[in-house]
Swiss-Prot record:
Coiled coil: none annotated. The keyword Oxidoreductase does not apply. Residues 25-45 are annotated as: Disordered. GO terms for cellular component: chloroplast; large ribosomal subunit. One of its GO terms (molecular function) is structural constituent of ribosome. It comes from Pyropia yezoensis. It comes from the Eukaryota. Belongs to the bacterial ribosomal protein bL35 family. This is Large ribosomal subunit protein bL35c.
Length: 65
């Protein structure tokens, strides 16, 4: 049986926590930041966990994480 390939695009965007959850960065933090409040920018910089509906698809593309 051949080796499974890891999707490099997915591997760059998601990390696995020590408890096994997938973590992601929030969107809307790359540009047009001047109109956003500092509170909004601060909350966008934190990580959050992936929704339960998306975990199966991400786990299939990251077989060795």
């Amino acid at each position: 049986m051949p080796k499974l390939k890891t999707s490099k695009a997915i591997a760059k965007r998601f990390k696995v926590s020590s408890s096994g959850k997938f973590l992601r960065h929030k969107a809307s933090k790359s540009h047009l930041l001047q109109k956003k409040s500092s509170k909004q920018r601060r909350h966008l910089s934190s990580t959050c966990s992936v929704d339960l509906k998306d975990i199966k698809n991400i786990a299939m593309q990251l077989p060795y994480l």
